[in-house]
Every structure is written in C-alpha cells, then in structure tokens.
C-alpha cells in the first residue's frame, strides 16, 4: 500500500529473498486514501487507485502479501482485500508495522511489528526511509484542551 507500505514491502521482500532464497515477487502498488496523516477523515468511502498496467493482472493461485504502515480502523485494509479478492488469489495475508488495535471491521494483520493500544486522538507516525531519514515509530499526542 502506497506510500509508506511500499518501502516496508521492499525491506520485507529483500529479507525473504535473502533468508529463504525466494524469487523476487511481483509488486503491485495500490494507492489507498481515507484519512490524512493527522487522522482527519478525507473521504467517507475509502478511495483505491489501481495502476493501469495491473488492471488485467491474474492472481489466481497466488499468495498475496499486503504491506502497510499502520492498521487503524480497517477501512483501507478492507478495501484492498476486497479489490484483491476479485482477482482470485489462493490466499491474502497482511503485514503491518503498527496495529493500533482499533479496527472496526472484520480484518486483521497476520504479521505485526508492534501492537499499540493508544487513545483515539493520538497519532502514530511511522518514519520510513526514503520518506524520512531514519526508521522509527513515534506517538504524537495532540494538545488537549485544559
């Protein structure tokens, strides 16, 4: 999932190829948007943008690994899983760097870097190269009224 999911997928892929000698997998980038980085709702329905070259992609029999930075309410992940399911893969697995443990929909991550049960207004910022200079996870607490 673009944006920060893509470099995470690259890191994960490189490690799997190195450790297990797997062939380089096909990469399918999906642009998904529902929330801004500050958790402001941008779109009432999750928007998914498909790259034209992937429209006719046949995933039958494949295992697909979806990689994203933060699992929040599950709306974006559900939209991605619905899209991929129409391409009939054998299995869809999900990896995320941070699970906020606040999903509202019947989706989950199979592989999670960190589960952080935090207050709803708090924000998880994932710093992922090349978008940021260093790799880290930060908890941002907006100013609360006194």
Can you describe what each PLM-predicted range is?
Residues 1-146:
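PRPP-associated nucleotide enzymes
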């Amino acid at each position: 999932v673009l944006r920060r999911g893509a470099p995470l997928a690259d890191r994960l892929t490189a490690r799997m190829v190195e450790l297990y000698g797997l062939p380089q997998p096909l990469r399918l980038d999906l642009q998904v948007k529902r929330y801004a980085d500050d958790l402001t709702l941008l779109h009432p329905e999750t928007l998914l943008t498909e790259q034209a070259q992937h429209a006719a992609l046949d995933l039958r029999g494949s295992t697909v690994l979806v990689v994203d930075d933060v699992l929040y309410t599950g709306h974006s992940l559900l939209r991605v899983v619905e899209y991929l399911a129409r391409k009939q893969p054998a299995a869809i697995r999900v990896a995320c760097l941070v699970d906020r443990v606040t999903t509202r929909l019947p989706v989950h991550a199979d592989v999670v870097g960190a589960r952080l049960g935090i207050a709803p207004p708090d924000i998880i910022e994932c710093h992922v190269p090349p978008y940021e200079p260093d790799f880290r996870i930060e908890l941002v607490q907006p100013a609360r009224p006194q």
